[in-house]
Regions:
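Acidic, surface-exposed loops and disordered segments
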Residues: 1-230
């Protein structure tokens, strides 16, 4: 066989320069992921998130920054299919009496090995945003839920199972993350403080930056750069 036969044949089929130079496709830019990363309150009921994808989402925490590199955060994955009891209790916390909320089929519960404090909260914010961006990259959306007490969250995750309760003994529940396929459209709406209605004290009126739904679209007002840059 002639020298370089395979390389020459590859070039004939795929074009000159193709051999030895596989073309890499770039993924979505950070700006694209940020725009797609919208809080979702209505999820598709027919879409499940695989355990592999959930592990991939949690895995970003092995690469992100951590205050003093303490790496105190721990994560519990709960899927409707695998953990129906815990899922049911977390679903109830998610809906919170608001029937228009449609829960996803999976949650990620975040715990800490240390009591909540300033640096734990900084780590938590980095973690939640990073996991949400990874979820978006995989085709999902998220919602961060932090209104519940630590006791409520621990109770929901344990779901009356002594083994599950033992697995989180000594940990401090923080928040949980809903992960699924969005069943709503979201749109960022640039707004300026110069256009804001003012209250009696001269400050922007309450509700100026509140998100809202209109004609099936979820609108999220965001201040323009000129308003946040000092």
């Amino acid at each position: 066989m002639a020298d370089n036969y395979l390389e020459k044949r590859y070039e004939e089929v795929f074009g000159a320069g193709a051999a030895g130079h596989s073309k890499k496709r770039g993924g979505p830019s950070l700006n694209t992921l940020l725009v797609r990363n919208r809080s979702t309150r209505r999820f598709r009921t027919d879409a499940e998130v695989s355990i592999e994808h959930l592990r991939t989402i949690v895995e970003v925490n092995t690469r992100i920054a951590s205050a003093m590199n303490r790496q105190t955060l721990r994560f519990g994955i709960v899927r409707k299919e695998d953990d129906p009891a815990a899922y049911g209790r977390l679903r109830d916390l998610y809906v919170h009496g608001q029937d228009w909320r449609i829960p996803p089929s999976s949650f990620i519960v975040v715990f800490s090995t240390l009591p909540e404090g300033r640096f734990i909260d900084i780590d938590l914010g980095i973690s939640l945003q990073s996991m949400s961006l990874k979820a978006v990259e995989l085709g999902y959306n998220c919602l961060m839920i932090g209104r519940n007490t630590a006791e409520e969250l621990a109770e929901a995750y344990s779901a009356g199972d002594p083994a599950r309760a033992a697995s989180i003994a000594g940990l401090h529940p923080l928040v949980f993350l809903a992960v699924g396929k969005a069943d709503q459209s979201a749109f960022l709406k640039p707004v300026s403080l110069a256009d804001a209605p003012l209250d009696e004290s001269g400050h922007p009126a309450p509700g100026f930056l509140a998100y809202y739904d209109k004609d099936g679209v979820h609108y999220v007002p965001k201040l323009v750069l000129e308003d946040i840059l000092l």
